[in-house]
From Swiss-Prot:
Lineage per the UniProt record: Viruses, Varidnaviria, Bamfordvirae, Nucleocytoviricota, Pokkesviricetes
The TFIIS central domain, residue ranges: 77-201
Protein name as catalogued: Transcription factor TFIIS homolog
Organism: African swine fever virus (isolate Pig/Kenya/KEN-50/1950) (ASFV)
Protein family: Belongs to the TFS-II family.
UniProt function note: Putative initiation factor. Necessary for efficient transcription elongation past template-encoded arresting sites.
PROSITE patterns the UniProt entry points to: TFIIS_CENTRAL, ZF_TFIIS_1, ZF_TFIIS_2
Amino acid sequence: MKMHIARDSIVYLLNKHLQNTILTNKIEQECFLQADTPKKYLQYIKPFLINCMTKNITTDLVMKDSKRLEPYITLEMRDIIQMMFFRTLQKHTFFRENTNLCTEYVQKIEASCYHYTYQQQEKTFLEEYSTRCGMINHIINCEKKSHQQQDNDALNKLISGELKPEAIGSMTFAELCPSAALKEKTEITLRSQQKVAEKTSQLYKCPNCKQRMCTYREVQTRALDEPSTIYCTCKKCGHEFIG
């Protein structure tokens, strides 16, 4: 009986904000069917209630997700994600000295990722949410490998206030890391423009027919500071191999 009263109350609260009885009943019923205990039911329905009350979910957004309705991003999981962002930002002196600001930024960054994910259709909610949060966490990490230290554009802009934490979740890699994106684009352009003219040489032995009559070409398939990859073709048997 208590569970029935609780469900009626939740339906009333959801419908009050969504103003869509059919959609409200569909959300509530899906959460109820997924849960095998009252505790899990409340755990599943809570994100919908909170987002509706704070006007972070519109009818259109929920209808886009109505085919999958995955309320598995619980508050506990969101807390874990926020803790991940908090630990990452705390690695930087600026945020260690400004704990309150760090907490505010963490909440806004996570919320930005969460709301962005609601609008995606290609992947399931959980997969998209986890992937985006992981990407953002890597980008704002000040303890990157030495060759990535110059790519802290997003973190520096976050500290200076140029980048708003509530906007970070919907930004592309190129927008967050213009230096790294430009470097990557330059490498791709250079690779596409490189000369791939074939040369003949007896330096390379064919592993198939054991002859040393091969043509070869050099291709820059890795980073620019690493050696080129040499592709060989045996003129005797036509076998292709890497020199």
